[in-house]
């Protein structure tokens, strides 16, 4: 394999690993949020917060030269998964 391509792929592998660990950490925190919401009888979803987050992160994507539509799709996927976890926590 070409050495340049090998270095690119190693960088991608490292970034992918970092993404997985960051997502794991994020889900630990959102799990705690879900448990808090369940014990305090709060709704699993907060549409206002979600929209503020999407708007903020779309701007970050623009600042980072990343497609904001892609970023929003990715984040909505994560948010939907978090809400599913919060709904499960509420059900017990």
Predicted regions and their residues:
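Domain-level signature for soluble enzymes in the chorismate/prephenate branch of the shikimate pathway
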Residues: 1-92
């Amino acid at each position: 394999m070409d050495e340049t391509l090998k270095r690119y792929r190693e960088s991608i592998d490292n970034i992918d690993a970092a993404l997985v660990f960051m997502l794991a950490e994020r889900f630990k925190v959102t799990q705690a949020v879900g448990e808090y919401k369940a014990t305090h009888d709060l709704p699993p979803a907060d549409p206002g917060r979600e929209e503020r987050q999407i708007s903020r992160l779309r701007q970050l994507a623009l600042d980072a030269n990343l497609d904001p539509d892609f970023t929003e799709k990715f984040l909505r996927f994560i948010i939907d998964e978090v809400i599913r976890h919060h709904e499960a926590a509420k059900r017990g």
